[in-house]
Amino acid sequence: FGGELSGHFYFAENFNADSGAMAFAAVCSAVTEDGRPLSEIITAARRYCQSGEINFEVDDKAAAMERLVAAFPDAEVLRLDGVTVDLGNWWCNVRPSNTEPLLRLNLEAANEQEVSEHLSDVAPLLGTQVDH
Protein backbone atom coordinates (compact mmCIF):
# COMPACT_ATOMS: atom_id res chain seq x y z
CA PHE A 1 0.00 0.00 0.00
CA GLY A 2 1.15 3.51 -0.73
CA GLY A 3 -0.49 6.86 -0.39
CA GLU A 4 -0.02 10.57 -0.95
CA LEU A 5 -1.33 13.53 1.02
CA SER A 6 -2.94 14.64 -2.24
CA GLY A 7 -5.45 11.81 -1.89
CA HIS A 8 -4.01 9.11 -4.12
CA PHE A 9 -3.94 5.57 -2.71
CA TYR A 10 -2.13 2.66 -4.37
CA PHE A 11 -2.89 -0.98 -3.61
CA ALA A 12 -0.65 -3.95 -4.41
CA GLU A 13 -3.70 -6.13 -5.05
CA ASN A 14 -4.80 -3.60 -7.70
CA PHE A 15 -1.52 -3.89 -9.64
CA ASN A 16 -0.11 -0.97 -7.60
CA ALA A 17 -2.60 1.33 -9.30
CA ASP A 18 -4.38 4.29 -7.73
CA SER A 19 -7.89 3.40 -6.61
CA GLY A 20 -10.22 5.76 -4.80
CA ALA A 21 -12.89 3.06 -4.77
CA MET A 22 -10.63 0.60 -2.93
CA ALA A 23 -9.62 3.31 -0.45
CA PHE A 24 -13.28 4.13 0.19
CA ALA A 25 -14.11 0.44 0.70
CA ALA A 26 -11.19 0.03 3.13
CA VAL A 27 -12.33 3.03 5.19
CA CYS A 28 -15.94 1.80 5.26
CA SER A 29 -14.74 -1.63 6.40
CA ALA A 30 -12.56 -0.13 9.15
CA VAL A 31 -15.40 2.06 10.46
CA THR A 32 -17.81 -0.89 10.44
CA GLU A 33 -15.37 -3.17 12.28
CA ASP A 34 -14.30 -0.51 14.81
CA GLY A 35 -17.75 0.85 15.62
CA ARG A 36 -16.56 4.40 16.31
CA PRO A 37 -17.22 7.39 14.06
CA LEU A 38 -14.52 8.00 11.46
CA SER A 39 -13.64 11.32 13.14
CA GLU A 40 -12.70 9.47 16.35
CA ILE A 41 -10.65 6.86 14.51
CA ILE A 42 -8.70 9.55 12.67
CA THR A 43 -8.07 11.59 15.83
CA ALA A 44 -6.67 8.55 17.63
CA ALA A 45 -4.38 7.71 14.70
CA ARG A 46 -3.08 11.22 14.05
CA ARG A 47 0.37 11.74 15.53
CA TYR A 48 1.72 14.58 13.42
CA CYS A 49 0.51 17.79 11.84
CA GLN A 50 0.91 18.16 8.08
CA SER A 51 1.23 21.19 5.85
CA GLY A 52 -0.63 19.63 2.96
CA GLU A 53 0.90 19.95 -0.48
CA ILE A 54 2.18 23.46 -1.19
CA ASN A 55 3.25 24.44 -4.70
CA PHE A 56 6.13 26.73 -5.65
CA GLU A 57 6.98 28.15 -9.08
CA VAL A 58 10.69 27.91 -9.73
CA ASP A 59 13.07 28.55 -12.61
CA ASP A 60 15.51 25.79 -11.64
CA LYS A 61 13.95 22.89 -9.72
CA ALA A 62 17.26 21.13 -9.04
CA ALA A 63 18.90 24.30 -7.67
CA ALA A 64 15.95 24.96 -5.36
CA MET A 65 16.13 21.42 -3.98
CA GLU A 66 19.87 21.81 -3.38
CA ARG A 67 19.26 25.09 -1.51
CA LEU A 68 16.97 23.16 0.81
CA VAL A 69 19.64 20.50 1.44
CA ALA A 70 22.34 23.12 2.04
CA ALA A 71 20.17 25.01 4.54
CA PHE A 72 19.93 21.98 6.84
CA PRO A 73 23.41 20.40 6.96
CA ASP A 74 22.59 18.26 10.02
CA ALA A 75 19.58 16.63 8.37
CA GLU A 76 19.32 13.12 7.03
CA VAL A 77 18.73 13.59 3.30
CA LEU A 78 16.88 11.06 1.16
CA ARG A 79 16.60 11.37 -2.61
CA LEU A 80 14.08 8.66 -3.39
CA ASP A 81 11.25 10.95 -4.57
CA GLY A 82 12.65 14.45 -4.91
CA VAL A 83 14.47 15.49 -1.75
CA THR A 84 13.43 14.62 1.79
CA VAL A 85 15.11 16.51 4.63
CA ASP A 86 14.59 14.72 7.96
CA LEU A 87 15.60 16.47 11.16
CA GLY A 88 14.13 13.90 13.55
CA ASN A 89 11.36 16.00 15.08
CA TRP A 90 10.19 17.31 11.69
CA TRP A 91 10.73 16.58 8.02
CA CYS A 92 9.83 17.90 4.61
CA ASN A 93 9.81 16.53 1.09
CA VAL A 94 10.14 18.60 -2.06
CA ARG A 95 9.58 16.96 -5.40
CA PRO A 96 9.35 18.34 -8.89
CA SER A 97 6.06 18.19 -10.73
CA ASN A 98 6.28 16.13 -13.90
CA THR A 99 3.62 18.22 -15.63
CA GLU A 100 4.17 21.82 -14.44
CA PRO A 101 7.14 24.10 -13.62
CA LEU A 102 6.46 23.54 -9.92
CA LEU A 103 8.03 22.09 -6.83
CA ARG A 104 5.61 20.42 -4.43
CA LEU A 105 6.37 20.70 -0.71
CA ASN A 106 4.98 18.54 2.09
CA LEU A 107 6.10 19.23 5.65
CA GLU A 108 5.26 17.38 8.84
CA ALA A 109 5.92 18.29 12.49
CA ALA A 110 4.46 17.64 15.94
CA ASN A 111 1.91 20.48 15.90
CA GLU A 112 0.55 23.37 13.82
CA GLN A 113 2.88 25.94 15.39
CA GLU A 114 5.96 23.91 14.48
CA VAL A 115 4.67 23.34 10.95
CA SER A 116 4.21 27.10 10.57
CA GLU A 117 7.67 27.87 11.97
CA HIS A 118 9.42 25.37 9.72
CA LEU A 119 7.43 26.51 6.68
CA SER A 120 8.69 30.04 7.27
CA ASP A 121 12.25 28.69 7.10
CA VAL A 122 11.75 26.40 4.10
CA ALA A 123 9.45 28.40 1.80
CA PRO A 124 11.91 31.22 0.97
CA LEU A 125 14.41 28.62 -0.27
CA LEU A 126 12.06 27.21 -2.88
CA GLY A 127 10.54 29.98 -4.99
CA THR A 128 7.19 31.69 -5.31
CA GLN A 129 4.26 29.99 -3.60
CA VAL A 130 1.26 29.53 -5.89
CA ASP A 131 -2.29 28.33 -5.31
CA HIS A 132 -2.48 25.52 -7.86
Predicted feature descriptions by range:
Residues 1-132:
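Phosphate-binding and adjacent anionic-ligand microenvironments
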